[in-house]
């Protein structure tokens, strides 16, 4: 098919309140780091011990996947910003936008960005 000529830059995210993969990448570990999981409004990504964490970290290393955390206080703001554009998303999806914002703070503006909208707002009870 040939639509994509090279492997795209992928940025993974975790909630700042539950970030075992982020902590592992930061420390250069092959296994997820044990973290104290705090309650997060992005409950869909609150996984303290990822079942295939070692495999995920290996994939991140092999494909140079960056991982950033979504600041909890920016998730609600991101959800509101996306709502102003006409999309009703749940908090875990809003974390994608909060993490993208964080990525841009750390690494500069990003162009040609694809952010998935995989959760309708009605899924969340917040």
Segments and roles (model prediction):
Residues 2-7, 11-91:
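Active-site/ligand-binding loops adjacent to catalytic centers
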């Amino acid at each position: 098919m040939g639509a994509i000529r090279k492997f795209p830059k992928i940025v993974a995210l975790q909630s700042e309140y539950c970030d075992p993969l982020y902590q592992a990448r930061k420390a250069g570990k092959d296994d997820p780091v044990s973290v104290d999981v705090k309650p997060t409004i992005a409950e869909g990504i609150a996984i303290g011990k990822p079942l295939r964490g070692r495999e995920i970290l290996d994939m991140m290393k092999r494909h140079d996947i960056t991982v950033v955390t979504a600041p909890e206080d920016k998730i609600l703001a991101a959800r509101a910003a996306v709502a102003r554009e006409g999309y009703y998303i749940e908090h875990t999806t809003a974390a994608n936008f909060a993490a993208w914002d964080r990525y841009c703070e750390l690494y500069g503006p990003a162009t040609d960005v694809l952010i998935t909208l995989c959760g309708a707002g009605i899924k969340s009870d917040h």
